[in-house]
From Swiss-Prot:
Keywords from the UniProt entry: GTPase activation
Induction and repression of expression: In response to ultrasound associated with a high frequency electromagnetic field.
Protein's name in the database: Rho-GTPase-activating protein
Subunit comment: May bind to Rho-GTPase.
Disulfide bridges in this chain: none
Species annotation: Rattus norvegicus
Any coiled-coil regions, as ranges: none
GO MF entries: GTPase activator activity
Protein task: May keep Rho-GTPase in a GDP-bound form.
Amino acid sequence: LFEENGGAL
């Protein structure tokens, strides 16, 4: 999944 800041989890 991708957070709002664009960081991939």
